[in-house]
């Protein structure tokens, strides 16, 4: 009798989870259907170059920095799109991270220009040329595929970590600093991207309109703490050589995403 009583809430919970999962899958199909239209409509305004830079840095250290990868007008469009966002999803894990995030699915409505840039042929070709093999954007249900990272309160940071690879192929993080400044002084913020390489700590320059490409599963990295009257807004994107995944990796990804996007990540 007791076991039958306990089965009722368990079954109810399972049905509720399945319903949320199906609803989320439908939403992702609708967003995917919109992506082509967004890329065409906002891609015209971005007016990205047809040709790639003639000289590209070497990727042997699994991280490169490309200054001024975007025309000024295109960069300003992305920056303004990021700054008109609504509230960020704040996360705080003692001794590891603190900050705000805007997830991929929300960018389709509040910053479609950013989605168009992420899906652009120019960015895909540029990243492929830098890395040395073809890459593609990661799937829409991965909330970290394309997101905005807001360091907007004192002490916002993320401690030393690797970026876990949830896919069968190689996985890369691509960053574009959209805002990085002290709000009252003419200088960059105190939040700095630092990597550990050959037992040395190296600060990676992140002024606005810089493209940073790195293989996060191989590059140990952190972002130092923001101070008062500072703002740092990063466009964070991910690409991979093979976007397929396994059930186990997909489950791990969803639990990881809880740290950034809350419990709703469980049914992405």
Cite the ranges covered by each PLM segment.
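Catalytic core of non-heme Fe(II) oxygenases with the double-stranded beta-helix
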Residues: 128-218, 230-233, 241-249
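Short, well-ordered beta-to-alpha junction loops that form the rim of enzyme active sites
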Residues: 68-69, 217, 237
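Short glycine-rich, flexible loops that bind phosphorylated cofactors or substrates
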Residues: 221-222
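Short N-terminal helix-initiation segments at or just after the protein's N-terminus
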Residues: 5-8, 110-123, 138-139, 175-186, ...
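Fe(II)/2-oxoglutarate
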Residues: 1-59, 258-268
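Non-heme Fe(II)/2-oxoglutarate
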Residues: 43-131, 225-268
